A protein has these predicted regions:
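Core, highly hydrophobic multi-pass alpha-helical transmembrane subunits of bioenergetic inner membranes
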Residues: 1-573
Length: 573
């Protein structure tokens, strides 16, 4: 499992690095961008390979730090805010993982595979499992931490392709796959199932009321992650891993195609005014539509093999009617926003008739997209053979089997209707813009869990800043140190400007001290009963040598000073 997943990470990373050659070719900091991408992939590899919790934490923390650097790569206020939101949201998961590491040390080691036998017996394992779930839902942006994933689209599109497909958001899913026994054996899976169901439903509705191209794809990532967590909480680990790999393929292709479209139309992302692009960029739009159909679960594409299997398992699972309806309505919403995107790409309005150079990108980007589209068409079948060597045969009544197809058809029809009558709703329904903003902004969850939680700490911080940082703390702290340093520097400056006088004064003082010492040496010796046999002559010799030495140094120093200050001649050496 580890080797297969890390091979997908390296494959998609390689295509993303090829993709950046033409996307940000004129960037001055291109080498820094490549270094960040490689460090990002290395952190993900460190997290995947090692089962030790310390190694997982190193890779986990590296993903959070480097993702902040990548999100703020474009130097603007929007990127800064998105980077701070991404970083602080992931910090919650880091704290939970640190507590988990400290707690599991009670068993004697950080390698969790040694303690799987304690899962059914020890109550403390429930606490560790809860901490793992908290860490995972922050990284995979589940409710209530869903606000950072749509905001992270401020990063360059190659970064979004890597983050949403195989690295940052999938890190939380992979952590749950590795620790699945910690919560599947307990009641924690029921809470995880509820969180995943709400995330699927809210993100599906939000994508249908959103007009930002990259944000729609980001919300679809949120929906697919919820789908993976939902099937994982039921207990089907291999199927969750299967869909994780297939999702990585079509999501990388979706973001690369979206980046090509945005790049060619000068960074404009509103889908309402960039329609009918199939006439100008046929290859890119074809690849984009194939990836969208794979997202819907179109038969014989890679997404079909995993999504159809998940739907059949949900139909046979022992769940209540509320969760059943929530799941199938969310599936219809996925098809709805996917067909909405396809409609705008094929038939929508195009308001850039004055831009004459709109075509498919160069050979390098087309090569990256072609590599993904080939794997997209064949990868589902190949992965099914690798992960499930024995075929899975599910028998169910025809009516229940047709329910999946009916849901997808209804979702596509509703998506087509929404695309055609959005202007009608805007004119006829009262407060339509408010409803669209509420549903498109994920039910104001970003506003509640960013501004709503942080507003009071920020107010208290402002009070502390006024009373401490801008009050007595500043007066007796930094400002007082500054005044002391300034006073000392003035004194040293005075000494430095008068160093010749000071040097001569020190020489004179030293001369007086030696003279007094020699005069009173005989009396000191008599008082201390010393015998003077040639000692006085030695003291006189020492005095004469010191006098000559200071005289020589004084003359040389004076000559150097004169040459430097008056004549501009190089000082004597």
């Amino acid at each position: 499992m580890r080797i297969l997943f890390i091979s997908f990470v390296f494959f998609i990373s390689c295509l993303v690095i090829f993709y950046r050659k033409e996307y940000i070719i004129s960037d001055y900091n291109i080498n820094r961008f490549i270094f960040l991408i490689l460090a990002f992939v290395a952190s993900m590899a460190l997290m995947i390979i090692r089962p030790n919790l310390i190694s997982i934490l190193l890779g986990w923390d590296g993903l959070g730090l480097i993702s902040y650097c990548l999100v703020i790569y474009f130097q603007n206020v929007k990127s800064y805010n998105a980077g701070i939101l991404t970083f602080l949201s992931n910090r919650v998961g880091d704290v939970a993982l640190l507590i988990c590491i400290a707690w599991i040390l009670n068993y004697g080691s950080w390698n969790f595979i040694f303690y799987l036998n304690f899962v059914r017996e020890d109550f403390e394992i429930i606490i560790i499992g809860g901490l793992v779930i908290l860490a995972a839902i922050t990284k995979r942006a589940q409710i209530p931490f869903s606000s950072w994933l749509p905001a992270a689209i401020a990063a360059p599109t190659p970064v979004s392709a890597l983050v949403h497909s195989s690295t940052l958001v999938t890190a939380g899913v992979y952590l749950l796959i590795r620790f699945n026994i910690f919560f599947t054996e307990r009641k924690l899976s029921q809470y995880l199932l509820l969180i995943a169901g709400l995330t699927i439903f809210i993100s599906g509705i939000g994508a249908n009321f959103e007009f930002d191209l990259k944000k729609i794809i980001a919300l679809s990532t949120l929906r697919q992650l919820g789908l993976i967590i939902r099937i994982l909480s039921i207990g089907f680990v291999k199927i969750a891993f299967f869909h994780l790999l297939t999702h990585a393929l079509f999501k990388a292709l979706l973001f690369i195609c979206a980046g090509v479209i945005i790049h060619r139309i000068k960074n404009f992302q509103d889908i309402r005014v960039i329609g009918a692009l199939v006439n100008y960029m046929p290859v890119t739009i074809t690849y984009f539509n194939i990836a969208n159909l794979a997202l819907c679960g179109m038969p014989f594409l890679a997404g079909f093999y995993s999504k159809d299997l998940i739907l059949e398992i949900v139909l046979l699972s022992n769940i209540n009617i509320f969760r059943f309806l929530l799941y199938f309505v969310s599936t219809g919403l996925t098809v709805c926003y996917s067909f909405r995107l396809i409609f705008y790409r094929l038939r929508g309005d195009f308001n850039f008739f004055r831009i004459h150079i709109i075509n498919d990108e160069g050979y390098t980007i087309l090569k990256s997209m072609s590599g993904l589209i080939i794997i997209r068409l064949l990868g589902g079948r190949i992965l099914r053979w690798l992960i499930f060597p024995n075929p899975i045969i599910i028998c169910m009544p025809v009516i229940i089997k047709l329910l999946i197809l009916i849901t997808c058809i209804l979702g596509g029809v509703i998506g087509y209707i929404i695309s055609n009558v959005s202007l009608y709703f805007n004119n006829k329904i009262k407060n339509y813009n408010l409803i669209r903003t509420f549903l498109g902004d994920i039910w104001f969850i970003p506003l509640i869990f960013t501004c709503g939680i942080s507003i009071r700490p920020l107010k208290y911080r402002l009070i502390i800043k006024k009373r401490l940082d801008m009050g007595w703390k500043e007066f007796f702290g930094g400002q007082k140190i500054y005044r002391r340093i300034k006073t000392s520097s003035i004194i040293f400056n005075i000494l430095n400007n008068n160093y010749f006088k000071i040097y001569f004064l020190l020489f004179f003082i030293w001369f007086i001290v030696l003279f007094i010492f020699i005069i009173y040496s005989n009396s000191l010796k008599r008082a201390l009963h010393w015998r003077c046999k040639g000692d006085c002559y030695n003291l006189w010799i020492i005095f004469i040598i010191n006098l000559l030495y200071f005289y020589n140094e004084n003359v040389r120093f004076y000559l150097n000073y004169i040459n430097r200050e008056i004549n501009g001649i190089t000082p004597l050496k």
